[in-house]
Curated annotation (Swiss-Prot):
It comes from Thermus thermophilus (strain ATCC BAA-163 / DSM 7039 / HB27). This is Triosephosphate isomerase. Keywords: Cytoplasm, Gluconeogenesis, Glycolysis, Isomerase. PROSITE patterns: TIM_1 (PS00171), TIM_2 (PS51440). Its EC number is 5.3.1.1. One of its GO terms (molecular function) is triose-phosphate isomerase activity. It is found in: Cytoplasm. Its main location: cytoplasm. It holds the Pfam family TIM.
C-alpha cells in the first residue's frame, strides 16, 4: 500500500518571517494524518522549517539541489547541506528548471544521484508541454524524459524515489488534466518504472500528480489507482487550502 503524499512546492514565495508564522499555524491546526505531508520552500526558509516543524508529522525539503558534491560552484546548494538541514525530499527536474535554466535529463539524473547519496528522496518531475500533447505525443515525450532522468539512478528501495507527473500546460494556468488523463499517464510511468527497476519495485513507487492541484479536484484525482498524491503549487501557499488537501488525503 502506497502512502499518499501531499507535497507543497512554494516556489519563490514567502520570506522566512512569513514562513515562520505559517508553520506555527500549521503546527497548531494540523489534524492527525494517515497520509504524509511535506513543504518545499525556498532555500532561506529551510532553517525555519527545521526549527518549527521538527516535532511534527510534516516533512520538508528543497526545490532543487546542485549536481556537484561540493566545491567552487558559486550560488549552488549541495545535497550534503540539505541533509544537514534535515531535508527529507528535494525536487529535481521541475519544468520551470528545465525551461528557464536549460536543465537536461542528464543533469537531473546527476542531481537525483547526489540526493540519494545523502539519504534524501528525489521528487523527480516529468511532463509534456501543450504543443506535444496536441500532437498526440505526450506519452513518448514524458517517458523519454523519465528514462533519461533516471539514467544511472539506483534508489536503495521504492520508498526512496517519488515521481511527479506535471503536465506543463496545466501548471499555474488553472487548466487541469482530468483524473482519467492523469491515471492514463501514471499507468504509463509505472510501466516504464517496471521495465527499469522491476514490477515489485515499481508497484511501490509513489507517483504524484502536479498540475493545478486544489481542494476541488484532489479527491477525484486520488480516486485513481495510480495517483498517489499531489505536488501542489498555488494551493499550498494558503494554509486553509493546504489543510483542506491534507483532510482529503486522510
Amino acid at each position: 500500500m502506497r502512502r499518499v503524499l501531499v507535497a507543497g512546492n512554494w516556489k519563490m514565495h514567502k520570506t522566512p518571517s512569513e514562513a515562520r508564522v505559517w508553520f506555527a499555524e500549521l503546527k497548531r491546526l494540523l489534524p492527525p494524518l494517515q497520509s504524509e505531508a511535506a513543504v518545499l520552500p525556498a532555500f532561506p526558509i529551510l532553517p525555519v522549517a527545521k526549527e518549527v516543524l521538527a516535532e511534527t508529522q510534516v516533512g520538508y525539503g528543497a526545490q532543487d539541489v546542485s549536481a556537484h558534491k561540493e566545491g567552487a560552484y558559486t550560488g549552488e546548494v549541495s545535497a550534503r547541506m540539505l541533509s544537514d538541514l534535515g531535508c527529507r525530499y528535494a525536487i529535481v527536474g521541475h519544468s520551470e528548471r528545465r525551461r528557464y535554466h536549460g536543465e537536461t535529463d542528464a543533469l537531473v539524473a546527476e542531481k537525483a544521484k547526489r540526493l540519494l547519496e545523502e539519504g534524501i528522496t528525489p521528487i523527480l518531475c516529468v511532463g509534456e508541454p501543450l504543443e506535444v500533447r496536441e500532437k498526440g505525443e505526450a506519452v513518448p515525450y514524458t517517458l523519454r524524459q523519465l528514462r533519461g532522468s533516471l539514467e544511472g539512478v539506483e534508489p536503495p528501495g521504492p520508498e526512496a524515489l517519488v515521481i511527479a507527473y506535471e503536465p506543463v500546460w496545466a501548471i499555474g494556468t488553472g487548466k487541469n488534466a482530468t483524473p482519467e488523463d492523469a491515471e492514463a499517464m501514471h499507468q504509463e510511468i509505472r510501466k516504464a518504472l517496471s521495465e527499469r527497476y522491476g514490477e515489485a519495485f515499481a508497484s511501490r513507487v509513489r507517483i504524484l500528480y502536479g498540475g493545478s492541484v486544489n481542494p476541488k479536484n484532489f479527491a477525484d484525482l486520488l480516486s485513481m489507482p495510480n495517483v498517489d498524491g499531489g505536488l501542489v503549487g498555488g494551493a499550498s501557499l494558503e494554509l486553509e487550502s493546504f489543510l483542506a488537501l491534507l483532510r482529503i488525503a486522510g
